[in-house]
């Protein structure tokens, strides 16, 4: 019995497709080298193509043609041939989840990426930067206190600002932008009075 080959014809070039070079997308046969974007002629892969009415596009041109322009005429506007310089557009929610972030840590002012991000009171922090500014204690969402954007653990906050069981003085300090209480130097004990009964020899 002899091998008769395949009867499949490539949809793009209408030539016979041999099994070794066969690529089938949506039940349609193509040569691997004919599986190209109809706009930019870039070679496509099974995970990087889209098609509309049997016309193949790379993901970029499919989005540009159908999603952004809203046109289903399969024609690009004159002068709109895309190159490496893509149109400036806001990334989709899915795309932005993988493309990074513009959020800056309120403590160190460096970029905060989603895996290390902690957001409290509208501010973003690195998990490692979310610590007490007085003692450096690592904070949790249930163990922190903040005054004018400065983070404290509840223990140090109480030690620094609590007076006689009330936080009323905090309103005054907050209004005057005073964050830490005034530091009063410890008084040195007074030298003992000279002993009058002592005689110098």
Swiss-Prot record:
Q: Which one of the record's GO molecular function terms can you name?
A: metal ion binding
Which SUPFAM superfamilies does this chain map to? Glucocorticoid receptor-like (DNA-binding domain)
Region of interest (Disordered), ranges: 171-201
Top-level taxonomic group: Eukaryota
List GO BP terms, alphabetically. Answer: actin filament bundle assembly
Q: Which UniProt keywords apply?
A: LIM domain, Metal-binding, Repeat, Zinc
InterPro entries, from UniProt? Znf_LIM
Sequence ranges of Low complexity compositional bias: 177-187
Q: Which residues form the LIM zinc-binding domain?
A: 8-68, 103-163
Q: Which Pfam families match?
A: LIM
Q: What GO CC annotations are associated with the protein?
A: actin cytoskeleton; plasma membrane
**Description of how the protein assembles with itself and partners:** Interacts with NEK3.
List the PANTHER family: OS06G0237300 PROTEIN (PTHR24206)
Q: What is this protein called?
A: LIM domain-containing protein PLIM2b
What organism is recorded for this protein?
Answer: Oryza sativa subsp. japonica (Rice)
Q: What is the lineage of its organism?
A: Eukaryota, Viridiplantae, Streptophyta, Embryophyta, Tracheophyta
């Amino acid at each position: 019995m002899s091998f008769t080959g395949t009867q499949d014809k490539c949809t793009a070039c209408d030539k016979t497709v041999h099994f070794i070079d066969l690529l089938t997308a949506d039940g349609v046969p193509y040569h691997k080298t004919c599986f190209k974007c109809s706009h930019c002629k870039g070679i496509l892969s099974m995970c990087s193509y889209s098609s509309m009415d049997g016309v193949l596009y790379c993901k970029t041109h499919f989005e540009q043609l159908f999603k952004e322009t809203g046109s289903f005429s399969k024609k690009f506007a004159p002068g709109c041939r895309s190159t490496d310089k893509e149109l400036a557009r806001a990334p989709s929610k899915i795309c932005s989840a993988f493309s990074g972030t513009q959020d800056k840590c309120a403590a160190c002012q460096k970029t905060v990426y989603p895996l290390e991000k902690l957001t409290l009171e509208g501010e973003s922090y690195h998990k490692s930067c979310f610590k007490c500014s007085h003692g450096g204690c690592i904070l949790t969402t249930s163990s922190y206190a903040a005054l004018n954007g400065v983070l404290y653990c509840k223990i140090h906050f109480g030690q620094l600002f609590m007076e006689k069981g009330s936080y009323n003085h905090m309103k005054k300090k907050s209004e005057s932008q005073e964050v830490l209480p005034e530091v009063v130097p410890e008084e040195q004990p007074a030298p003992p009075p000279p002993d009058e009964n002592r005689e110098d020899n």
